[in-house]
Amino acid sequence: MPIGVPKVPFRSPGEGDTSWVDIYNRLYRERLFFLGQEVDTEISNQLISLMIYLSIEKDTKDLYLFINSPGGWVISGMAIYDTMQFVRPDVQTICMGLAASIASFILVGGAITKRIAFPHARVMIHQPASSFYEAQTGEFILEAEELIKIRETITRVYVQRTGKPIWVVSEDMKRDVFMSATEAQAHGNVDLVTVQ
């Protein structure tokens, strides 16, 4: 029998009674949220709305995004990244398992000096991909051109946020490059590796 989403006690400031809320709502109230699945439109919209709401609520207190994701849809991930740059509070990113593909792009989008990896975390970068299997020739060409533009944008962001030269980032993005937490720190994808 599944246990569902655990409930935890919560008391709002100034209220006498404790109410039981699901654990995610409790964590959201502490400005902690999670990307623990493949990136798609739904999770992207949820994270974006949370960041905007919490930044309106208090624009000086940091937000914390914990990441354990295999990646997913590029445009949805870029929307999360753009929102992180747009909101006023710093967004601290914490890799706690795997940040692969577009999830590593989100990880690198955290506030500089506030991008963290757990000691056994893994980070993987590569170029964006698409499937052209059933496309007409004209569609194939248009999609390939769009993919090249997206790759250039992602490369530019990695260069800006890691401090690595463009040739290093371009070379790394030609294939799947997996990094340990310390390798990701040396590469500039994270700023700090937590101690064991």
Curated annotation (Swiss-Prot):
Catalytic activity: Hydrolysis of proteins to small peptides in the presence of ATP and magnesium. alpha-casein is the usual test substrate. In the absence of ATP, only oligopeptides shorter than five residues are hydrolyzed (such as succinyl-Leu-Tyr-|-NHMec, and Leu-Tyr-Leu-|-Tyr-Trp, in which cleavage of the -Tyr-|-Leu- and -Tyr-|-Trp bonds also occurs)
Enzyme Commission designation: 3.4.21.92
Enzyme class: hydrolase
Main location class: plastid
Location in or out of the cell: Plastid, Chloroplast stroma
BP terms from Gene Ontology: protein quality control for misfolded or incompletely synthesized proteins
GO MF entries: ATP-dependent peptidase activity; ATPase binding; serine-type endopeptidase activity
Keywords: Chloroplast, Hydrolase, Plastid, Protease, Serine protease
Any one GO cellular component localisation term in the record: endopeptidase Clp complex
Signal peptide: none
Any one Pfam family match given in the protein's UniProt record, by short name: CLP_protease
InterPro entries per UniProt: ClpP (IPR001907), ClpP/crotonase-like_dom_sf (IPR029045), ClpP/TepA (IPR023562), ClpP_His_AS (IPR033135)
Top-level taxon of origin: Eukaryota
Active-site residue list: S101, H126
HAMAP family listed in its UniProt record: ClpP
Protein role: Cleaves peptides in various proteins in a process that requires ATP hydrolysis. Has a chymotrypsin-like activity. Plays a major role in the degradation of misfolded proteins.
Family the entry assigns: Belongs to the peptidase S14 family.
Assembly behavior: Component of the chloroplastic Clp protease core complex.
Protein name: ATP-dependent Clp protease proteolytic subunit
Gene of this entry: clpP
